[in-house]
Amino acid sequence: MSNLPIINFINFNQNGSCISMGTSQGFKIFNCEPFGRFYQDEEGGCGIVEMLFSTSLLAVVGMGDNPAMSPRRLRMLNTKRHSVICEVTFPTTILSVKMNKSRLAVLLQEQIYIYDISNMRLLHTIETSMNAQGIMSMSPNSENNYLVYPSPPKVINSEIKDHATTNNINIKKTDAVDDTIKKDYSLQVPSDITGQQQQQQPGVDPATSNNTANKIIKNGDVIVFNLQTLQPTMVIEAHKGEIAALKLSADGTLLATASEKGTIIRVFNVENGSKVYQFRRGTYPTKISSLSFSKDNQFLAVCSSSKTVHIFKLGKNTVDNKSNELNSDDEIEDDLVPRYGDEDEEDEEIDEEATSINSNHSSKEPVVDAKRSTVGRMIRKSSQRLSRKAARTLGAYFPIKVSSILEPSRHFASLKITTSSNQPIKAIAAIDDPIELSIKEYPDLFEKNASNNGDYQNSDTLTMVPIRVVSSEGFMYKYISDPERGGDCILLEQYSLLSD
């Protein structure tokens, strides 16, 4: 086991049909269906290996094992001819590479270089803030040709004075009155929680410290950049905290986002920036490693460091109505509970976790098959019953829109990656088109679930959605999920990406 290479990079191609993997020895390319390795190179460690759909074009960045494999050098390879098409060297380390059939984007720590992929001509350079995690996403669709990346942090000055009270609020009429107000503020010394007056620390300017305390750093915005016009189109206010993951849908119309906290997943309309879905992944913070849409935008897969993949069902809801009502809920929430600092951001995220879109559910409303009994589900049911009871009780005292905040929107299906390691892992999922599965081919597999689902016994074939997951441990898992009932996904196949 010690001779196995170290995995530096792993990803699906744009349509989820292939897997590219960079290791300490080189890189490998796999086909998903049927599974098998069809290309391998061992010239040196690779940190980035990106494919252009299922073509022979590869974008490869080395790990610095030798001068030819510098982490600052991008190599465009043709796997059919086993040749290097071109090489481009950048001033700093390359953190991410994304491409579609018309554009190629190279992300450095503080710049994004955009090229015409047909001739590798530099079209534009974007100056950004520090993006050490290499977070960006490009639309695979050349018609809705967008690039998204985190916006530079914004400093917001709070209008609330730290020691202001309702006893000294005055209406500003003249400069003299303004001077009086300033004097009043400067004379006041707030009391601490013990009731004793706080002493000013030597060498600290009260005015400076107050200005610093009243500043809030907002770093949860996302910039949408049009790769055709080479202009930014909008800034989406996605989260309060730092962005951890971004993903554009296959058609480039939807954007999924997650913050560092990892409890809330949001989906936005790329055309107008409106929020169309909001999902609660869980209660406890976790690191989101990837987001991925199905090709038809019906499902969204969220992979986290807790080795769990949550599947959310988006359905075909009306975007405008949903976004308007969600925005109204946000306004109500902001009016009810004003927030002014980092200390309250966690509470705000918890409140926002409960923001519901239940009042907008279409006929495609996610339904989890309640007949499937598991210990985890019984525990969740008990917890959810208490939550709903509390929501109904509190909802009786609030307006309809406010009470809707109390009902969370949960995942439609989920799976737990099978691993013996106790360490956090990174995973990426790809949701394929539905398939017809013969029960006779997998009798043992469906026998375990037949007792909890009568439909398995009354038909020869089942319509299932394949979900492929690749992990940083070097495995590819193929799960299947019921597109109507959801629930626990069933493991169908498992392969090692490291073994020969």
Swiss-Prot record:
Residues 362-372 have a biased composition (Basic and acidic residues). Residues 192-212, 320-374 are annotated as: Disordered. One of its GO terms (biological process) is autophagy. A motif (L/FRRG motif) lies at residues 279-283. SUPFAM superfamilies: WD40 repeat-like. The PI(3,5)P2 regulatory complex regulates both the synthesis and turnover of phosphatidylinositol 3,5-bisphosphate (PtdIns(3,5)P2). Necessary for proper vacuole morphology. Plays an important role in osmotically-induced vacuole fragmentation. Required for cytoplasm to vacuole transport (Cvt) vesicle formation, pexophagy and starvation-induced autophagy. Involved in correct ATG9 trafficking to the pre-autophagosomal structure. Might also be involved in premeiotic DNA replication. This is Autophagy-related protein 18. The lineage of its organism: Eukaryota, Fungi, Dikarya, Ascomycota, Saccharomycotina.
